């Protein structure tokens, strides 16, 4: 099932440092799209409320860092931690394996 949410409410003005050194704007929607694919692959359904909770938790964890740049591998760690804490272990495992680019 697709996670349908998020209008980057309370957006974060931050750059993501990609593995090749490029900088890219942080976009929660891009993360949500990746999680949609992971939930489909894990055959685990996530509803809109789940999506909002996941997004909120990820954004909260990022804000706590109080940085204007974050490495993509650190961002990945935060996403996986949030998924596991919210009980989406299977999706966290698929996401972890699938984002090795």
PLM ranges: what are they?
Residues 2-101:
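Long, C-terminal-biased catalytic regions of enzyme "large/alpha" subunits
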């Amino acid at each position: 099932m697709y996670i349908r949410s998020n209008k980057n409410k309370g957006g974060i003005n931050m750059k993501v440092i990609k593995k090749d050194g490029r900088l890219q704007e942080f976009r929660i929607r891009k993360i949500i799209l990746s999680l949609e694919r992971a939930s489909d692959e894990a055959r685990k359904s996530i509803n809109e409320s789940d999506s909002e909770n996941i997004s909120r938790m990820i954004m909260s964890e990022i804000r706590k860092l109080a940085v204007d740049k974050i490495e993509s591998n650190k961002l990945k760690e935060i996403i996986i931690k949030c998924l596991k804490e919210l009980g989406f272990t299977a999706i966290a495992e698929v996401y972890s394996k699938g984002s090795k680019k």
